[in-house]
UniProtKB/Swiss-Prot annotation:
GO terms for cellular component: mitochondrial membrane. Keywords: Membrane, Mitochondrion, Transit peptide, Transmembrane, Transmembrane helix. The keyword Magnesium does not apply. The chain crosses the membrane at residues 63-82. Coiled coil: none annotated. This is Altered inheritance of mitochondria protein 36, mitochondrial. It is a single-pass membrane protein. Residues 1-47 form a transit peptide.
Length: 283
């Protein structure tokens, strides 16, 4: 009986290898020399490539990688904190630093016409509403300290003076009066500031003065603007008799509300004072 001879053709060998791969078996590796001649078995140890160890997915990262990640995190945190500290706003400036800051940002400090250092020399008393200005001035002049002179500023007279002198606000006032439009916010305060600035440049303006602002301010916006641009107001005087008898007759409901808001605004900071014929001295 003839002995079975195993086929050795390349096609047959590839088919066998494919079958082994499907079956999960690794086909035998045959080491071949550069000229296609099979090498002896003892040479396989020198020419065969050792199998690499592949880390399984369930194996965790090595400790050195964890250490590197920790150090990198601390380094990044340190970098971020130093950058934030560099950009932290300054709470104090020297005069030169503040001037440089103003030039860079375009901001300007708001300068009052009369700063707090001169509050003892010039005392401003606001009278939001007075039915009869001349009568109210006579009453209040007796209550003010005698050691200071008294100056009275009335917005109505300021408007008449501005129109007569053809000042810088005269054309605006003419248009507003011609069309019976309300005065824009801040205009009365601008006229007040202009009048006070002129007064300070006179001889009388060099002496201690109590300044009565009659029928002013009649809105909280004007009050705030005055204290920002001109000076601090010492007291808001509430003429009790005028408020009780004439306020609603002289002003519209909206204006009454605004005047009461002014009184409430100064009352919250303890600067509102009610005055009647029985009061002898203003605080």
């Amino acid at each position: 009986m003839a002995r079975y001879k195993r086929p050795t053709s390349p096609k047959f060998q590839r088919a066998i290898n494919m079958f082994r791969l499907v079956a999960g078996k690794r086909p035998p590796v045959r080491t071949v020399l550069s000229r296609g001649i099979p090498c002896p078995s003892f040479a396989k140890a020198f020419y065969s490539t050792p199998q690499r160890k592949i880390r399984k997915p369930e194996e965790g990262p090595k400790i050195r990688y964890l250490v590197l990640v920790v150090f990198a995190s601390f380094g990044l945190l340190h970098f971020v904190t130093t950058q934030v500290d560099k950009k932290a706003p300054k709470n104090s400036f020297t005069e030169r630093e503040f001037e440089q800051y103003e030039r860079e940002t375009g901001l300007r400090r708001r300068h009052k016409l009369i700063n707090h250092e001169k509050n003892d020399q010039y005392a401003f008393y606001a009278v939001p509403y007075a039915h009869d200005v001349s009568k109210a001035v006579q009453l209040l002049t007796k209550m003010l300290p005698n050691e200071k002179q008294v100056k009275v500023i009335d917005p109505k007279q300021l408007i008449e003076k501005e129109l007569e002198d053809e000042g810088k606000y005269s054309y605006l006032l003419q248009d507003l009066l011609a069309y019976k439009k309300p005065l824009p916010r801040g205009l009365i305060t601008a006229l007040m500031k202009q009048e006070i600035e002129l007064f300070l440049n006179t001889t009388k303006g060099q002496f201690d003065t109590n300044i009565l602002l009659m029928n002013y301010p009649q809105s909280t916006d004007e009050a705030i603007k005055f204290e920002n641009d001109v000076s601090e107001l010492k007291t808001c005087i509430v003429l009790e008799d005028d408020f009780a008898k004439s306020l609603h007759d002289d002003l519209s409901d909206d204006d009454v509300r605004k005047v009461n808001n002014v009184v409430g605004y100064f009352d919250t900071v303890g600067k509102a004072e009610k005055v009647n014929s029985k009061v002898k001295v203003l605080n």
